[in-house]
Curated annotation (Swiss-Prot):
Expression induction: By cold. Expressed only after a duration of cold exposure that is effective for vernalization. Strongly down-regulated after return to a warm growth temperature.
Reported phenotype of the disruption mutant: Impaired vernalization response with incomplete repression of FLC during and after cold exposure, due to a reduction in vernalization-induced histone H3 deacetylation and methylation (e.g. H3K4me3 and H3K27me3).
GO molecular function, one term: zinc ion binding
CDD domains listed in its UniProt record: FN3 (cd00063), PHD_VIN3_plant (cd15521)
Biological process terms in GO annotation: cellular response to cold; negative regulation of gene expression, epigenetic; response to cold; response to hypoxia; vernalization response
Species in which this protein is naturally found: Arabidopsis thaliana
Protein name in the entry: Protein VERNALIZATION INSENSITIVE 3
Length: 620
């Protein structure tokens, strides 16, 4: 039955439903029979509703003439599942049915959507990932193991992978366990044909083996555990077995293994015997690690830097900027920055030890990350020669290293906590009692041996120069001055014991000093030069005039900066001023936020330098 004819019949008499139609309303009997409600099935009713979907008023009138059960059957057929709307009345059901019929053409019934989803699921392929949670690389259909993290021989991976225990092919990128490569002779490790090289187990091409050997020796040299030392030496000896070109390296390995076996027995059973012993407790531990160092140096002489894995990185220049009794300031620079990212330096590790000590601690004193190049090492002993080793490193590992020697200044004071002043040997600096003859006759001796201990550069200050400095101090201390209407706060210092009398007669006296008398003395103390101080004062004054800081902060800041600021604080202030010079508002906020706490704390400079006439002392 055509939908158009049904629509025309319904519009002819809107009060007559399909069940009330008689034969007089139609011209042909076929149309009469098909319009009767008993003859129309669910699919024909759906076609009729879809034909009237563009005419919602006529469709609503037609649906109102049908029973609730007939409408429910059409809704269930449209949705593709059985539903029971017991709580909805007939008008609401008609509204839901019209909404279902008026859906866009792309939205078919739920059954159609379900079938399309099943087809999509069947079309989606599954991706096989590596079982290693740290890798999770996608594997091909023909891959039996992950070439990214698994061994190409045993096809297993390590949960905590140590790259020094793996052999990697430069051609195909495959890798294998070092132990797996040593078990089979067909990979060429220790053969006469390949001296210092090995065959890749995956592609068969030969690769360098000395880089892996150097890693074993380096770990053995730096480790503190006996089990690690034994294991790495055993691997280093196996990697060079049968060699003729590197016979001297093998002899050093044999000697180290022989000495170690004298303490722990055969290396095959070291794990059960020694467990996790300490290398320093072995009688041969230090000597064995020295042999490892000699083996690494011998390899560097034989193999060119391009062939060695630990090729030297950028050239370093290490110089000592300031030496005091208990600290030293070191600057490390890279002269020739490397263009390749592989050898690009990330930072430097500083290891400081006494020259008489044979070995350096495995933990560095400090680490300097670029672009920072200056570092201070604290806690040194006065009048002692030290050896400083600087090692450059990047993400791959250590690159280059350099050593120099220096000697700290003498500290004649009784208190070990005070640092040495660069102008006098006394621990109390220029604040010591000038009436004592010992203070007037002290000489300054400053020595530093640079460049691997080749030469000692010694500077001497005569007694006359020191005496002139003390004479200037006497003139300064007799005068008192006020800073912006307020007296300078008296800062008590530690006591000096008078050495001329038995029983230690201790005297203290208070004094106040003018800041305008000798500004250059304080400038030498905290590292603020005349030009730098003038530039900072002008900048702070400009900040006050533009309203970025108030008068109170300006007074406190300039007093603190010129009298109590340390070398590091002075350097930070200079960096802030140079960086935020074009943005004075940000500069003012940064200075207030960074130095407010330091300004309020009434401490003196902690760099060991006591400015003349500034550190006030009481004498009884």
């Amino acid at each position: 039955m055509q939908a158009a004819s049904l629509s025309k019949i319904w519009r002819f008499d809107g009060n007559v439903g399909p069940e009330n139609m008689d034969s007089s309303s139609f011209e042909d009997n076929e149309c009469i029979e098909t319009c009767k409600p008993n003859v129309l099935n669910v699919s024909e009713r759906r076609e009729l509703i879809h034909a009237l979907s563009n005419q919602p008023e006529e469709a609503s009138e037609l649906l109102n003439s049908w029973s609730r059960n007939e409408i429910m059957k059409i809704i269930c057929a449209e949705m593709g599942k059985e539903r029971k709307y017991t709580g909805l009345n007939k008008p609401k059901l008609i509204e839901n049915l019209l909404n279902l019929v008026s859906r866009p053409l792309g939205e078919t019934s739920c059954s159609d959507r379900r079938n399309s989803r099943k087809k999509e699921k069947k079309m989606i392929g599954y991706i096989i990932c590596c079982e290693n949670l740290a890798c999770r690389a996608a594997l091909g259909c023909d891959d039996t193991f992950c070439r990214r993290c698994s061994c190409c021989i045993c096809q297993k991976f390590d949960d905590n992978k140590d790259p020094s225990l793996w052999l990697t092919c430069d051609a195909c990128g495959s890798s294998c366990h070092l132990e797996c490569g040593l078990k089979q002779d067909r990979y060429g490790i220790g053969s006469d044909d390949l001296d210092g090289r090995f065959y890749c187990a995956y592609c068969g091409k030969d690769n360098d083996l000395l880089g892996c050997w150097r890693k074993q020796v380096k770990v053995a040299k730096e480790t503190r555990r006996v089990d690690v030392l034994c294991y790495r030496l055993s691997l280093g000896q196996k990697l060079l077995r049968g060699t003729t070109k590197y016979r001297n390296l093998l002899e050093l390995m044999d000697e180290a293994v022989k000495k170690l076996e004298g303490d722990v027995g055969p290396l095959s059973g070291w794990a059960m015997k020694m467990a996790r012993g300490i290398v320093n407790r072995l009688s041969s531990g230090v000597h064995v690690q020295k042999l490892c160092s000699q083996a690494m140096e011998a390899l560097d002489k034989v193999v060119s830097p391009s062939e060695s894995v630990s090729g030297q990185g950028d050239k370093m220049t290490v110089r000592v900027e300031e030496i005091q009794a208990r600290s030293v300031t070191v600057r490390v620079d890279s002269e020739e920055p490397s263009s390749s990212t592989q050898n690009k330096i990330t930072g430097f590790r500083l290891f400081c030890r006494k020259s008489k000590d044979e070995e350096c601690s495995s933990q560095g004193n400090c680490v300097v990350y670029l672009p920072e190049t200056t570092s201070a090492i604290q806690g040194l002993e006065p009048d002692t020669e030290f050896c400083l080793r600087v090692v450059s490193f990047n993400e791959e590992g250590d690159l280059d290293e350099s050593e120099l020697r220096f000697t700290t200044l003498k500290d004649d004071g009784d208190e070990a906590g005070d640092q040495q002043s660069p102008l006098t040997n006394s621990s109390s600096g220029l604040c010591s009692n000038p009436s004592l003859p010992e203070d007037e006759s002290n000489n300054v001796n400053k020595s530093c041996s640079k460049g691997n201990g080749d030469k000692d550069n010694t500077e001497h200050c005569s007694a006359g120069e020191v005496e002139s400095e003390l004479e200037e101090e006497r003139l300064v201390k007799r005068k008192a001055n006020k800073i912006d209407g307020r007296d300078l706060l008296v800062t008590p210092c530690k006591r000096d014991i008078y050495k001329g009398k038995q029983g230690g007669n201790k005297r203290f006296k208070s004094r106040t000093v003018s800041l305008n008398e000798k500004p250059e003395i304080n400038n030498a103390a905290n590292g603020v030069g005349d030009k730098d101080l003038g530039h900072i004062v002008k900048t702070i004054r400009c900040l006050e005039e533009e309203g970025h800081i108030d008068k109170s902060f300006r007074e406190r800041f300039l007093t603190w900066y010129s009298l109590r600021a340390t070398h590091r604080e002075v350097r930070v202030v200079k960096i802030f001023v140079e960086t935020f010079m074009e943005d004075l508002s940000s500069l003012g906020q940064q200075l207030v936020d960074t130095f407010s706490e330091s300004i309020l704390s009434k401490r003196s400079s902690t760099n060991g330098v006591v400015p003349a006439g500034i550190c006030l002392k009481l004498w009884h």
